Every structure is written in structure tokens, then in C-alpha cells.
Amino acid sequence: MLCGGWKRSRRSPEESRVSAQVAAPLAFPPSPASSDSSTKRPGLRALKKMGLTEDEDVQAMLRGSRLLKIRSRTWHKERLYRLQEDGLSVWFQRRIPRAASKHIFFVQHIEAVREGHQSEGLRRFGGAFAPACCLTIAFKGRRKNLDLAAPTAEEAQRWVRGLAKLRARLDAMSQRERLDHWIHSYLHRADSDQDSKMSFKEIKSLLRMVNVDMNDMYAYRLFKECDHSNNERLEGAEIEAFLRRLLKRPELEEIFRRYSGEDRVLSASELLEFLEDQGEDGATLACAQQLIQTYELNETAKQHELMTLDGFMMYLLSPEGAALNVAHTCVFQDMGQPLAHYFISSSHNTYLTDSQIGGTSSTEAYIRAFAQGCRCVELDCWEGPGGEPVIYHGHTLTSKILFRDVIQAVRDHAFTSSPYPVILSLENHCGLEQQAVMARHLRSILGDMLVTQALDSQNPEELPSPEQLKGRILVKGKKLPAARSEDGRILSDREEEEEEEEEAEEALEAAEQRSRAKQISPELSALAVYCCATRLRTLDPSPGPPQSCTVGSLSERKARKFTREAGTSFVRHNTQQLTRVYPLGLRMNSANYNPQEMWNSGCQLVALNFQTPGYEMDLNTGRFLINGQCGYVLKPAYLRQLNTTFDPECPGPPRTTLAIQVLTAQQLPKLNAEKPSSIVDPLVRVEIHGVPEDCAQKETDYVLNNGFNPCWEQTLQFRLRAPELVLVRFVVEDYDTTSPNDFVGQSTLPLSSLKQGYRHIHLLSKDGASLAPATLFVHIRIQNS
């Protein structure tokens, strides 16, 4: 429980006098709603707080624009697009009426806005429109790009500039400001007659919108407590008072009282005591004073180095108060070690936007992968018409894209999110002539980015480091002299994969159509400098020095077999050489495997289908969330030491205890926005992903009919043997008695980057988009034996 005793005040008389002036708690920063024009148009309150109500571009977006939506050479449809007054969403007209939620998209879900013919769709289908009139809105997750053409270049620019301003303001918002923004957008929607007054019926509608099923009698009592005019309508300050009551955080108030005592403000020394109890390493009085200056809202309190409840809540909702160590969100690891010492974010079938049977191939898939920090992408290369190689999933109905278009996308987008090296994993099915074309395109398009020879002064027995290869692109491919099969043929890349899969999947042997044998062109072979592709059939050490520049490829099944039968040998192999693991060919729907199993053995290039959401991609996102999301994460020391004895199947006795007290959640999303009476019954599951003996999951009870501020106060405890490898996945589900629970949100974090104490967990959707302001509030304790 959160209950705790009072603390005696240790302040001077002057501090006590000031504390009495500033102690009154607020739920928000003071609202200007009752004293300005936003009272007349309450929906504009959000834009006013963003400082954008007078912006000409935003004003034009509020009025709306008729833009052409472009899908093909013949499909050009005019649609009305209009920014909503909440500043968070854009409404658009549809030819076929659908549910209201299907007529909007949210600014926070936008990945990028590109001008001109920068998207694949506009390059192919936008020739009839001037580039200056065109723009592309690219979304996070699986939502398709929106390719648009405006009547004039100026109107296109207004949307490009306006969306950029809105995204920048949204990114700069604190969690508390997002909450304020969020609740007022629902308030505007609940005000059915738009008279800036709220009847009890409208208040009940608001409560259902924000996922609260409140007893009518209790809701009416709250309503009447705020109805100071006694006219059965709330307006202005009365509405703000109601929202303050609604958004109270009793559990935070209890923690605050423990440290602040009777006068309800924290001095710098009391805040320092809280930080020390939190386990903040190196916390000092100066740190506490700086936090007060950063997060306190009351200027009088700030001047006297005091923190009110509002400032305390602002701090706990900030990145500094979150569960993820904010120091780990930038590049903090040693980037000067050999490539084999890092986990490297890797994609399989990167070109696909859907399944590998009939999905679409697109350069946009590469752009999205790079935006997510991916550093190793796959190019499945086949003979194309007109002497130009194409990329697609061979012998299927997937569409085809030109090899050169993909290389241009690599050139333009490989280093937008990370400066560290990119590996192009070539699956080569082309003849000698088109292989030579591939080599020419790689050299001419990538230029100096492409690594074409070994680095000067580099130890030939060791791979270079990410730091040495900043801004460079490596080719993973076959190197002459090529490996030969038992009958002496030179194998194609796909045959190698098939040979391994046939060993494990003999039932498919008759159905497999084997690629014809092909040689490797000298031009393409010369580009495989540090990533020479080879089959990894055995872990027996070969005579002579280690072949550090070879990359062993193997299926998920073969990797599991190595881990089970020769765990330590596999780990040692991966201390010096790169290993790429790919999904079995049986996964026709582009499903993923559990990457944690491969990371446990030190495999660096664990390739997943980035286009397929699920817990596997959640783990991948969590693994690479740290170190600036640069796509490289340093492996634990026992996965880097040449003579390591670590075996993921036998990791030794437990040496760490993790205790997570799940306290509350805030503002969970509705699962069915079109059904007001649909309220979630949330439960929280905490999953541990690590070596097999560490894997576990435990969950709380469910809370009936409350997605707004459910409370659990339940502790879940885990004993861990290899904590450095552990990922902790927090999952919120809607409990269902008759069918599987429905997913609400999740967050996956590396244990090594978790901070102890009272922390907020910021939840993500199934596609990885932010669900702000939805959070979990937990207490974390990590004890090492």
C-alpha cells in the first residue's frame, strides 16, 4: 500500500511562510479559458496553448483544402482535408461514409511529410502534377502513405509547413501538457451544442469518452460540487474545477505527503531525500534544485526553491521521471569495438509491406525500416526486363521494384536516424550480366558511402567498429572463390537457404523449386569486403586464423539447434564473427520468431519482418530503444569474451531479484470508440524475456469498467539468472471472460536501462505508435545477490 506517515517539517520560518502561499494543489497549469476568446471556441484552446491560433498556415488548415488523393495513374480523387480544432487530428472526406474514427488521422501518428515526388507512389503516378504541388504524408506503423496534390504550390506548402509546426509543438509538449490537451479535446467533443457549457448529460458523455463508467450518483455529486452557479450547467472555471477533481492522482498525492509533511511543498533537501530513496545514482542538492527550476510551475515556489504537488507531478511524468533511464536514450555505449560485439537491428524481406505470398514490394518499406533504426536490410535480387535487376520475393505474386530505385532510397535515407553503418544483405539470383549492373549501380549511386576496400591500418583478423564505419555502407554477398556443393556446382544464395531448410523440412522437398546454379561476377564479389556470405553448417573451428569477415547465415531452426546442442561454442563463434538468422520459409504470412532466443547466443543480425507487428517486433523495438536508437547495442561482456564459458541453456544460479508493484494506470484508450458504453476492464501482465530459465510472466487482477484511472497495487516478483539480457514487457489487456483478452497497449524496456523507484511507463499501440497520455504507474525495485 502507498500509505505512509507524516514527516516533520525541517524548514526555516521563511520557507514555511512561503510554503503556505504556494501549497494549494492544481491539476493543470492555470487555464486562461475563462478570460479569452477560446471560451467562445473551446476547441481552439488547444491550439492557443500551442501558440498557433494566429499562424496563417494553421488557419488555412482549419478552413480546409480540397486536395487530390493519388493512388494510381487513373485513380485521382478530390477530398476535403481539414485540421480539427484540437490541433491533434485531421478530418477528411470519404466517398463511402464510415465510422467517425475512420475519417481522421492523428498528427502524432505521422512519421514524415515529404515535399514533391519523393514517394514511390508519386514518382510512379504523379507525373501529371507539378512536384511543387505534391506532398506525401508517411505514417508510423502499417498505414499506407497518403499521396496528395494541391491546386497550387502555395497550398501544398501551407500543409507541409503547418503539419511540421504541429508535429514540432506536439513533440515539445510535456506529458502533463499532452494530458491537458487530450482532456480538452474530449471536452470539446462532449459539448454537443457547442455552447461552452456542460450539462450533466454532457458530463456523462465525457466520462464514457475517456473510458470511465462512473456511478450516476457519484458523478452527479462531483458535478454539483463544481456547479457554484447552481444552474445545472458548468462553464469556465467550473469546468476546470470538475476536471481537476476528475484528474486527481491520490497515489501521487500520498507519495508527495510522505516527503513534504504538513505544509504540502517540498524543499530542495526533501526532494533530494525522495531522489535518494528512488535510487537515483549521484543525486545531489544541486540536482534537486535544478529539478525544481525545470518542473515547478509556480514562480513564487521556484524563486524559493520549493516544489508544489504540480511540479512534483510534472517531474514524475517527464522523461527524467520515466522508467527508462534518460541517459540511455542517447548514444552512451562504447562504439569503438568490433562489429561482432554488437546486436544490430536487422530486417528480413525488407522490401515487403505485407505477406511474402502476394504482398506489395516498395522502396517505402526500406525508408520506414531506416526510420526505425534498422541497420541491416535485405535485397532479394532477380533478373529483370531491359537488363535491370528487380527486387521481389521470387516465384510469388509479390510486386517488383527496380534494384536501382532501392539503392537510391538507401542513399537518401540510410543515415536519417542513425550515423552508424548499414549492411545491405544481397540475396542474389541474377546472372553474371545483371550482377555487373548491380555492382555498377552500387558504386555509382552510393559513391564514397560504399565500402569497396579494407580500411587502412585495420587489423585483418578483426572487424572494424561502428565508429570507424560511420556513414558507410557494407555489402553482404558471395565472395570468389564461391562455395561449391557436393556435386561441384556453384550455389546461388537462395539454394543455400533452401538446403538448410530442406534438412529441417524434408516434407517440403518435393515442393521446392530449386534455383539454377549461378556464378558470382567479379564486380559484385569485390564489394563483399567485410561481410562475405557463407553457410554456417558447423561450429567446429577451421584451421588457421578466424575468418572474421565472414557472415554465417542460418535459419531460426538451425540457430535453436546450435544453442541447444552447443551453446557455449555458438556464443564463442559469435564473439568474432557475424551471424545472420532469418525466419523459416514456412512463415508464408511473414510471421516472426522470438528474437530473444538468438540474442541469448550472441547472434548479431537477428532478421525480423518489420512489416509484421506483434510481440516479436515489440522485443526488437525494446532491445534497440537505448543507445540513441542508433541500431547498435553493445552485447553483455560474457557474449564478447573470446574464451567465455556462458551457456544460455545453463546460465547459473539466480543473482538478481526484480520486484514490480503495479500501482495505477492513466487514460487508457477505448478499444471501440464508436460504442460509448464500451469501457475496458484492464489488467496488467509483466513478461520477462531472457534466457530460458528467466522467461516468465505474471499478471494482476482485472479492474472492472475503468480505463481512466484503474488501481491495482499488486506486486509481481521475478528471480533472474542473466539480467543483462532481460527485456521487461509491460502489457495492458482488456479482460474478457468468454474470449481471449483484447490488447490495449504495451511497452518493452531493457532491464539494464530500467530506473528504480516510482516510475511512469508510457504505452504504445500494437503498431508501435504512442498512446499518449496513456501510462502505467509502477514501483520498481532491483536487488542483486
From Swiss-Prot:
The modification Phosphoserine is found at S101, S492, S569. Ca(2+) 5 binds at D734, Y735, D736. SMART domains: C2, PH, PLCXc, PLCYc. Keywords: Calcium, Cytoplasm, Hydrolase, Lipid degradation, Lipid metabolism, Membrane, Metal-binding, Phosphoprotein, Repeat, Transducer. Signal peptide: none annotated. Residues 494-509 have a biased composition (Acidic residues). It is a peripheral membrane protein. Its EC number is 3.1.4.11. Strongly activated by phosphatidic acid. Inhibited by phosphatidylethanolamine (PtdEtn), phosphatidylcholine (PtdCho), sphingomyelin and phosphatidylserine (PtdSer). One of its GO terms (cellular component) is cytoplasm. This is 1-phosphatidylinositol 4,5-bisphosphate phosphodiesterase delta-3. The keyword Metal-binding applies. Residues 484-493 have a biased composition (Basic and acidic residues). The keyword Secreted does not apply. It catalyses: a 1,2-diacyl-sn-glycero-3-phospho-(1D-myo-inositol-4,5-bisphosphate) + H2O = 1D-myo-inositol 1,4,5-trisphosphate + a 1,2-diacyl-sn-glycerol + H(+). Residues 636-765 form the C2 domain. The active site is at H348, H393. Residues 524-640 form the PI-PLC Y-box domain. Gene3D superfamilies: C2 domain, EF-hand, Phosphatidylinositol (PI) phosphodiesterase, Pleckstrin-homology domain (PH domain)/Phosphotyrosine-binding domain (PTB). Pfam families: C2 (PF00168), EF-hand_10 (PF14788), PI-PLC-X (PF00388), PI-PLC-Y (PF00387). Ca(2+) 1 binds at D191, D193, D195, K197, E202. It comes from Mus musculus. The gene is Plcd3. Its cofactor is Ca(2+).
